[in-house]
């Protein structure tokens, strides 16, 4: 049995079990990290090589999407074959691959916006806005410091036209819909 088949089977079984128990499962890190040079939390990380090297990873993501995973988290690394300028969590191109090519219509959660590889020299506020603009619905920030400033930056970005109001409304609607779907389903006893 190939590694991708084994990973798919285990991942799908885990997702089904977790979601049957009333928890929203999240598949990560899209589009896969078959090789990174550095730890993305503390250094800039890039996954080099042609898009074909991601085929096995993308097949696993197709399987977990087919199994009904409710959320996917784009990773912190840059994938030059898809988008040479943005980390996966702030890349509209990576998120388009997830949505358009793989047909994922669920919740997209950014990876930790405090990660050096996601920040890429930008402020946390700008990175949060970039992630939403790229198509994330929910932002992960590992510390509570600066949450008010992030919220203010998002409001300012909408006011200034940097972030479309409709994008923010769609993100909040998606988060509420997924949360509501979990509340309406009974938990396994």
What are the functions of these language-model segments?
Residues 1-6, 14, 181-189:
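Proteins with a high burden of low-complexity, intrinsically disordered sequence enriched in S/T/G/P/A and R
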Residues 3-156, 160-166:
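Second-shell residues forming the walls of enzyme active-site clefts
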Residues 156-187:
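Mid-to-C-terminal alpha-helical segments outside catalytic/metal-binding sites
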């Amino acid at each position: 049995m190939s590694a991708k088949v084994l990973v798919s089977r285990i991942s799908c079984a885990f997702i089904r079990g977790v979601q049957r128990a009333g928890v929203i499962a999240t598949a990560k890190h899209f589009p896969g990290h078959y090789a990174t040079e550095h730890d993305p939390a503390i250094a800039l990380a890039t996954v080099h090589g042609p898009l074909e090297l991601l085929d096995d990873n993308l097949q696993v993501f197709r399987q977990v999407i087919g199994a009904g995973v409710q959320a996917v988290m784009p990773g912190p690394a840059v994938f030059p074959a898809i988008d040479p300028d943005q980390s996966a969590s702030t890349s509209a191109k990576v998120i388009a691959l997830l949505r358009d090519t793989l047909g994922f219509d669920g919740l997209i959660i950014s990876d930790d916006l405090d990660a050096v590889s996601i920040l890429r020299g930008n402020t946390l506020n700008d990175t949060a806005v970039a992630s939403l603009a790229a198509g994330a619905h929910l932002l992960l920030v590992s510390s509570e410091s600066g949450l008010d400033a992030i919220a203010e930056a998002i409001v300012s970005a909408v006011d200034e036209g940097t972030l479309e109001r409709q994008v923010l409304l769609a993100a909040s609607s998606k988060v509420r819909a997924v949360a509501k779907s979990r509340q309406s389903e009974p938990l396994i006893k």
